[in-house]
Amino acid sequence: MKISRQAYADMFGPTVGDKVRLADTELWIEVEQDFTTYGEEVKFGGGKVIRDGQGQSQLLAAEVVDTVITNALIIDHWGIVKADVGLKDGRIAAIGKAGNPDVQPGVTIAIGASSEVIAGEGMILTAGGIDTHIHFICPQQIEEALMSGVTTMIGGGTGPATGTNATTCTSGPWHLARMLQAADAFPMNIGLTGKGNASLPEPLIEQVKAGAIGLKLHEDWGTTPASIDNCLSVADQYDVQVAIHTDTLNESGFVETTLGAFKGRTIHTYHTEGAGGGHAPDIIKACGFANVLPSSTNPTRPFTRNTIDEHLDMLMVCHHLDPSIAEDVAFAESRIRRETIAAEDILHDLGAFSMISSDSQAMGRVGEVITRTWQTADKMKKQRGPLPQDGEGNDNFRAKRYIAKYTINPAITHGISHEVGSVEVGKWADLVLWRPAFFGVKPTLILKGGAIAASLMGDANASIPTPQPVHYRPMFASYGGSLHATSLTFISQAAQASGLPEALGLKKKIAVVKGCRDVQKTDLIHNDYLPNIDVDPQTYQVKADGVLLWCEPAETLPMAQRYFLF
């Protein structure tokens, strides 16, 4: 029996050779491989396949998956494929062909009476996003991020304190303890960074032992060469990452001074273009060094006609500046440069900038990391055309490059890729389902540790789940003991070894960070280009390997107003 491609796609989702448009962008992906078997597809529903003795076997719970996501289109750094995905004990157990092995050939994911089904037909499945630049200013950020498709948040803070409004530091053991205890309340993987600004090791060591998974160097606390050197030395000793916001005013040295203080050691440079802070005007040079793991924050993603004006206002508020003081205004204006922001777009498209994060409520929007990543990809396709690595008539490589910026690469950078960051067997089942028309903007379903934590949901008093008002609501994995079983709190190996989780009475599952200190830019997937960057100190023009980097600001963007009328 044969059916048309259109009929097949309507029933089981796209298959090899079919193309899917991502939201209202000009980005098209093409299915590279289909792990399901034609004629043996499984689908749930009345008169469908997953019924007793048909697609559902007699196997016991230990032999079947807890949940199967059927016929999903996976977009991940490793491929764009159609598959069934099996989840077991909170992790991804298999990617392949689901069904009843007693009556169906080639089954790699057994379905039984103990299996739940999530219909992935016509849906896109991605790993949950990882945001590594979080100012924990208010707890409401966490729900906002979760509903956007982010499932891991890394950063620091203590609430709306003046220090937290500007810097991602949970300063000291007492604050770390309180924030780790608070993390138990949220269906989100959370890791905290301590304050890294000190010239002697002991104040930093005690924070790592208190649970910090990294240390943050910020110019507002004094990012001097001495503090940089000391912080990296402690990080090397305890296998935690260092994130840095460098010296915008060049008070304690220039970009070359800071790069020298790194001494070749691994470091995550925040907002490496500089509008979010850093050596003016040439911190962008840092993206050309193998030990530097560069990221952007999302307000400059992508460069638009509103970017410059918006940033000046943001900066005055976030860094406690006074518009009536000439020196404060000059400080703000030195950080916001059209030329370097335009270059940042292109450096992302070339794979020289490796990650995108938010800078939540501190010159960044916590719910827009994913949207702005894909807006940047779309802008670059329109302005620069297909990438040389893309296939005929598709944007598959570009899609893999950009999705890696907020999934696997932040995970590698911060030593958590053994747990999260991709749709791969063995990883924690933090997964997001999207309708293609809403991809990157409004997810349909967010899973944490294999259970549904958030979803679009209609009127709870309706006779079916879909009547309006439809909006995002927490689901059962956001409550009670289920929350503790399906979300992770990341801590340092030193804190785990000392029994910190037990001492603090932490309830969520605990995971440790590891392998942070030997990461190089070449380890960051699809985003490992090391250009030689030159910035003209007068015009701010940026060249990479001698080529001028300039693009016009966007007048309009996809994934914008038309999605937020309701």
Swiss-Prot record:
Protein's cellular compartments: Cytoplasm
Gene Ontology annotations for the cellular component aspect, listed alphabetically: cytoplasm
InterPro entries reported for this sequence: Amidohydro-rel (IPR006680), Metal-dep_hydrolase_composite (IPR011059), Metal_Hydrolase (IPR032466), Urease_alpha_N_dom (IPR011612), Urease_alpha_subunit (IPR050112), Urease_AS (IPR017950), Urease_asu (IPR005848), Urease_asu_c (IPR017951)
Positions annotated as active site in the UniProt record: H319
Family annotation (SUPFAM superfamilies): Composite domain of metallo-dependent hydrolases (SSF51338), Metallo-dependent hydrolases (SSF51556)
Main location: cytoplasm
EC category: hydrolase
Residues where substrate binds: H218
Keywords for this protein: Cytoplasm, Hydrolase, Metal-binding, Nickel
Binding-site residues for Ni(2+) 2, renumbered to this chain: K216, H245, H271
Family from the record: Belongs to the metallo-dependent hydrolases superfamily. Urease alpha subunit family.
Protein's name in the database: Urease subunit alpha
